[in-house]
């Protein structure tokens, strides 16, 4: 039995291929940054976006503040209609005579009409600057007094002026809507 050589198991075996020998330590570059750094960057980006949005909203709020806060057309009509029904055709305002504000202020001063000058002025501005009022200003249309009687007719110059005003008001309304959209976004 001694003649037969049995294979002996060893723990250290020689590999058949050659392994490269390292002469130095290799440097491994990690491509992903640590989680804390990623979180910090995201928070910084979010804070920058929020600051930019806040600045944009503040600028929009400041730009929106230059426009008058007039009541709506319905509120203005409901303010004036109980005391001067001749100025309205149903719920739509008629074209007002020139100098009607002074006449209305005089009526408020002499009568028992509980309207302040400011409220009356704002209601008249809301009516005369409305799109429906300016669209109705065509050459030959009638202007009415407080009793509902015709006083004069619209001239060509007044019609041209109304068209300019209408363009300006539509442009302002478009700008206002854009600014309001900026304020409403989150």
From Swiss-Prot:
Location of region: Disordered: 1-20
One Pfam family named in its UniProt record: ProQ
UniProt entry tagged with the keyword Methyltransferase: no
InterPro entries in the cross-refs: Fertility_inhibition_FinO_N, ProQ/FinO, ProQ/FinO_sf
An example molecular function term from Gene Ontology annotations: RNA binding
The entry's keywords: Conjugation, Plasmid, Repressor, RNA-binding, Transcription, Transcription regulation
UniProt xrefs under CDD domains: FinO_conjug_rep
Free-text function comment from the UniProt entry: One of the components on the FinOP fertility inhibition complex, which inhibits the expression of traJ gene, which in turn regulates the expression of some 20 transfer genes. The transfer genes are responsible for the process, called conjugal transfer, in which DNA is transmitted from one bacterial host to another. RNA-binding that interacts with the traJ mRNA and its antisense RNA, finP, stabilizing finP against endonucleolytic degradation and facilitating sense-antisense RNA recognition.
Protein name: Fertility inhibition protein
Taxonomic path: Bacteria, Pseudomonadati, Pseudomonadota, Gammaproteobacteria, Enterobacterales
């Amino acid at each position: 039995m001694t003649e037969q050589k049995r294979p002996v198991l060893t723990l250290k075996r020689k590999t058949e291929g050659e392994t490269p020998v390292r002469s130095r330590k290799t440097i491994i570059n990690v491509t992903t940054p640590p989680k804390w750094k990623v979180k910090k960057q995201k928070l910084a980006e979010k804070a920058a976006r929020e600051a930019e949005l806040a600045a944009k909203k503040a600028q929009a709020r400041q730009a929106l503040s230059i426009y008058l806060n007039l009541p709506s057309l319905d509120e203005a009509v409901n303010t004036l209609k109980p005391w001067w029904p001749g100025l309205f055709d149903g719920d739509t305002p008629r074209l007002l005579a020139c100098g009607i504000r002074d006449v209305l202020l005089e009526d408020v001063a002499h009568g028992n009409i509980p309207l302040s000058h400011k409220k009356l002025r704002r209601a008249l501005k809301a009516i005369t600057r409305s799109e429906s009022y300016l669209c109705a200003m065509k050459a030959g249309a009638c202007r009415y007094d407080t009793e509902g009687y015709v006083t004069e007719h619209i001239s060509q110059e007044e019609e041209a002026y109304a068209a300019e005003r209408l363009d300006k008001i539509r442009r302002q309304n478009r700008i206002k809507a854009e600014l309001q959209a900026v304020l409403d976004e989150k």
